[in-house]
A protein has these predicted regions:
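Conserved C-terminal alpha-helix-loop-beta "cap" of PLP-dependent enzymes
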Residues: 244-326, 331-338
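Short loop-beta-helix segment that forms the pyridoxal 5′-phosphate
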Residues: 15, 26-45
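ATP-dependent carboxylate/acyl-activation modules
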Residues: 9, 197, 201, 214-219, ...
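Active-site C-terminal subdomain of aminotransferase-like
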Residues: 162-263, 267, 271-274, 345
Length: 358
């Protein structure tokens, strides 16, 4: 009875879920996506399980970049334990792809904000047959080359930046996208386009069995939880703004981050990278900077010897001015681009009329 009622309640939302899947596929450069998962860390754990299944369970080592968000690393480690998988966290430059490795997870941009792709590591991963999983920032993909265009097999992340408040960490709708050939291993709900008895287009939940109840530990996924309301919010945010406005939002975020970067460098501070989207890591000179920020309700990532700062789509020029004041430096306009030429996005996205009509 519960299943029937739930299915009926989903009926009117299916077109919006389809929009969500289209949005994710377009931005990540992948071929197929589900209609949300619980959160980004869970999506990473699901992607690891999916990669293990693709290897037929014959390999047991999973590599994770040390510059993946720490909460994601922790959830992946926890999920790996009952599956008897070994998780190795290291710098991607040190990854060794032997016969026991079935997949790897990297962050794009990295947790420290760096926008880069380790081409040599990618070549080794692909040559070994390892499944490449990328945890991506959805808004950044309006400006930087999507993972699907540089070799990713699975892309995961969350859609919080598309109109959903931070909410002290959640809830937010996560996503997972992959290649068409891996669709049978994709966890979660998938909305497909079919035909009704009259030959009219009809939407339905595709490739779905309640196997988590039937196959138990051998199921594609044991996590049934989606984030329906949050996926609807993120989807409609994209429908409302469309590709051009989303790009403008991303450009504004990147511009404000670039102002902070150029101001810090001009003021004599050491910043971790010239390639970034919305996050930078700056060497700490004055321990009182964090104290000043906290008094004004700015929360930095304290690395000990350095500070991590992220700018989001709600930030204003006034906010950046306050950050600059904390460091006692001057506002300096940026020169040049913060994205490497090889990683600038050149492909179109959100071209469907639903994203360009309202």
């Amino acid at each position: 009875a519960t299943t029937e009622i739930y299915t009926l309640s989903l009926h009117d939302a299916l077109p919006i879920f389809l929009n969500f899947q289209t949005m994710i596929c377009d931005l990540t450069g992948m071929e197929i996506a589900n209609s949300s998962l619980l959160d980004e860390a869970t999506a990473a754990a699901e992607a690891m399980t999916m990669a293990c299944n693709l290897a037929r369970g014959k390999k047991h080592v999973f590599l994770v970049s040390d510059d993946v968000n720490p909460q994601t690393i922790n959830v992946v480690k926890t999920r790996a334990e009952p599956l008897n998988l070994k998780v190795i966290v290291d710098n991607p430059s040190n990854f060794r792809f032997d016969e026991n490795v079935f997949g790897l997870l990297i962050q794009y941009p990295s947790a420290e904000g760096v926008v880069s792709v380790n081409s040599k590591m990618m070549e080794k991963a692909q040559a070994s047959g390892s499944v490449v999983i990328v945890a991506a920032d959805l808004l950044s993909l309006c400006l930087i080359k999507p993972p699907g265009e540089w070799g990713a097999d699975i892309v995961i992340g969350n859609s919080q930046r598309f109109g959903v408040p931070m909410g002290f960490g959640g809830p937010h709708a996560a996503f997972i996208a992959t290649k068409e050939k891996f669709k049978r291993c994709l966890p979660g709900r998938l909305v497909g386009v079919s035909q009704d008895v009259h030959g009219n287009p009809a939407l339905r939940l595709a490739m779905q069995t309640r196997e988590q109840h039937i196959r138990r530990d051998r199921a594609t996924s044991n996590i049934c939880t989606a984030q329906v309301l949050l996926a609807i919010m993120a989807s409609m945010y994209a429908v409302y703004h469309g590709p051009n406005k989303l790009r403008q939002i991303a450009e504004r975020v990147n511009y404000l981050t670039s102002v902070l970067h150029s101001s810090l460098v001009s003021g004599g501070y050491t910043v971790n990278s010239k390639s970034f989207f919305d996050t930078i890591k700056v060497a700490k000179k004055d321990k009182k900077v964090i104290e000043k920020a906290l008094k004004k309700k700015f929360n930095f990532w304290d690395y000990g010897d350095s500070i991590g700062i992220s700018i989001d789509e709600t930030a204003t020029n006034s906010d950046i001015g306050k950050l600059i004041d904390f460091f006692e430096i001057e506002w300096v306009e940026p020169v040049g681009s913060s994205t490497p030429p090889s990683l600038v996005r050149r492909s179109d996205y959100l071209t469907h009329p639903v994203f360009n009509t309202y």
